[in-house]
Each structure stands twice: as structure tokens, then as C-alpha cells.
């Protein structure tokens, strides 16, 4: 099939795993994809799965444009003296796009085409590597997953909505190494937003608000090292007023401009608090005392 890509003058990139995925595209898929993207586009990855529940595999193609002006050094601050440095190699920084091809009888049709919804895979992560994107089809849902190593991960989940795709769930986990700080879950079907804050993480607002209770809890066992405490979360459930977010209308799903959905946490789209509760994987007697103390101060 890679031979077919070359015969159709369709460039491709990606690593060995992604190129193997591209090799599984058939002629019908390639023909539908080619009319949806400009000529200056290389295929980057392909994911198969049944999105419209007709029993036939659909395909999501990740592509990357190849405009010359976006070929530049990997890092900023490179010059003639550093051109041979591995961080100054010329890479493709064109943004990546996605084409969702749905089966329709004996052919495929592009349901949604977004030419630049993702950042390039060659962004400079500074002192840490940049988040890594994975696209997945599971249970007829389209998922965009970002892994950021010790800093956490986040995921957007879309489902077919007419001829478009609607955001149905969002999940993010903010970590500081092994310590969880925040977990955010958005349910756009039931219009709920859950935000869990780790009461034992000193950097967040909930710790500062209930510091007296937390320090009392920690004094129960002076022999236990501070870093050994399990996470204990206070979870606040809000009404989420947002009606629908369509994939065709989303401009960017990446990390360069921040996790754009996190803005909903501090916007007018949030309604009243519906519930406050606590959870932990290992909630023991001392943790119960902490929960009672915090609950008494809410």
C-alpha cells in the first residue's frame, strides 16, 4: 500500500508504527482523503474503527502540511555556529490536521476535515518533552489523547452527531511528578463538571483553604514522611451550561495555547455547585477525621 501512496503522489511521514498504520489504507480511503486535503500534505497516521455503527471500518487520517516556510530549526536561538547541534536540525513545524472518513455503501466520504487542529510533532518542550498526541477509535467514539509524562494527561472524546462529531467527555489530570494535583471531568451529555483537588498537595487553593485540618491530620502519625501520604480529594460537582461543542467548529486541540476546555472551569458556563464529596483510594480512619474537619469548614 505504501507503493500505492507513491503512485498517487501522496507523501507520508511519521515513525515506523505510524507508517505501518498508513499501509493499511485501501484505495477508496486514499481517494476520499486526497480530495479533502491540499497537495502540500503528508499523511502522518491512520486509525481504523467503526464510528457510525454500520459494521464497516471507518478511518481517521492524521495529516501534516508541508509548506516550506514552516521548515525551521527544532529549537529557538539557533544560528550558523549551532546548525550541527541535534536541537537545531531543520524539522517540519507545520501543524497537523485530521480527516474523518465514514463508510457510505461502497465508498468513503469525509465527514469532518480539520487541516490544522493539532500542533506539529516537532515542538520544543523546553526542559521537558512536549505532550504526545494519540488518536484512537474505541466503542464508536473518537478520542484525542495527550500524554505529558510526569505532568499528567488529558483526553477529548467525540461521538458522531449527524454529519459532525460532538464532544461528549473531557478528562484531565494535572500532576507534579507522582503527586496528583487536580482531576477534571466534564460530561457534556449530562451537563456536569467534576473538579477534584488533592487536599494533600500544598500548591493548590484547597490546601490553603483547609490547611488547619490538613496539618492536624498529618500530626496523627509523625513518623510518616510527607511524600508518603496518599491523595485525598475534595470533589465539587457543578452544573455545566455548555450545550454542544462540534469538532467542525473547534479551532485547536493542542497544548500550545493551553488546555482550552479548562477555561470553562472559571467561566459563566458553570452553574451552581450540585454536590461536594470526598474520595481516596485508601480512605482510612485518619482520613475520615480529615474529611469531617474539612466538611465542617465548607
Residues covered by each model-derived region:
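Residue-level detector of high-confidence beta-strand sites
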Residues: 62, 111-113, 170
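Acidic, small-residue rich beta-repeat scaffolds with periodic aromatic anchors
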Residues: 1-14, 125-298
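Acidic/hydrophobic-patterned starts of short beta strands in beta-sheet-rich repeat architectures
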Residues: 51-64, 136-146
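Beta-propeller blade repeat segments, especially FG-GAP/WD-type strand-to-loop junctions
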Residues: 2-4, 8-11, 68-115, 158-161
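Blade-edge motifs of beta-propeller repeat domains
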Residues: 1-39, 106-129, 246, 262, ...
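Short beta-turn/strand-loop junction motif enriched in small, turn-promoting residues
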Residues: 48, 65-68
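Primarily EF-hand calcium-binding motifs
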Residues: 41-46
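A short catalytic or substrate-binding loop motif that flags glycine-/basic-rich loops and adjacent residues
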Residues: 39-40, 53, 91-92, 149
Amino acid at each position: 500500500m505504501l507503493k500505492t501512496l507513491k503512485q498517487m503522489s501522496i507523501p507520508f511521514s511519521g515513525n515506523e508504527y505510524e507508517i505501518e498504520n498508513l499501509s493499511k489504507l485501501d484505495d477508496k480511503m486514499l481517494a476520499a482523503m486526497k480530495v479533502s486535503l491540499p497537495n502540500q500534505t503528508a499523511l502522518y497516521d491512520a486509525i481504523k474503527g467503526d464510528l457510525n455503527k454500520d459494521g464497516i471500518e471507518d478511518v481517521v487520517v492524521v495529516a501534516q502540511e508541508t509548506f516550506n516556510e514552516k521548515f525551521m530549526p527544532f529549537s529557538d536561538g539557533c544560528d550558523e555556529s549551532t546548525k550541527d547541534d541535534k536541537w537545531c536540525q531543520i524539522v517540519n513545524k507545520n501543524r497537523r490536521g485530521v480527516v474523518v472518513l465514514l463508510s457510505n455503501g461502497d465508498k468513503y466520504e469525509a465527514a469532518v476535515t480539520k487541516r490544522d487542529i493539532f500542533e506539529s510533532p516537532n515542538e520544543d518542550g523546553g526542559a521537558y518533552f512536549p505532550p504526545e498526541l494519540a488518536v484512537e477509535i474505541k466503542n464508536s467514539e473518537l478520542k484525542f489523547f495527550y500524554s505529558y509524562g510526569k505532568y499528567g494527561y488529558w483526553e477529548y472524546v467525540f461521538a458522531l452527531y449527524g454529519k459532525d462529531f460532538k464532544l461528549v467527555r473531557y478528562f484531565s489530570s494535572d500532576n507534579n511528578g507522582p503527586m496528583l494535583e487536580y482531576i477534571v471531568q466534564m460530561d457534556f451529555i449530562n451537563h456536569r463538571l467534576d473538579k477534584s483537588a488533592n487536599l494533600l498537595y500544598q500548591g493548590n487553593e484547597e490546601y490553603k483553604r483547609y490547611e488547619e485540618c490538613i496539618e492536624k491530620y498529618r500530626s496523627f502519625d509523625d513518623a510518616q514522611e510527607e511524600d508518603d501520604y496518599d491523595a485525598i480529594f475534595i470533589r465539587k460537582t457543578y452544573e455545566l451550561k455548555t450545550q454542544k461543542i462540534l469538532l467542525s467548529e473547534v479551532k485547536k486541540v493542542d497544548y500550545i495555547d493551553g488546555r482550552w476546555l479548562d477555561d470553562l472551569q472559571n467561566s459563566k458556563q458553570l452553574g451552581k455547585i450540585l454536590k461536594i464529596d470526598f474520595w481516596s483510594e485508601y480512605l482510612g480512619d485518619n482520613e475520615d477525621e480529615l474529611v469531617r474537619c474539612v466538611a465542617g469548614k465548607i
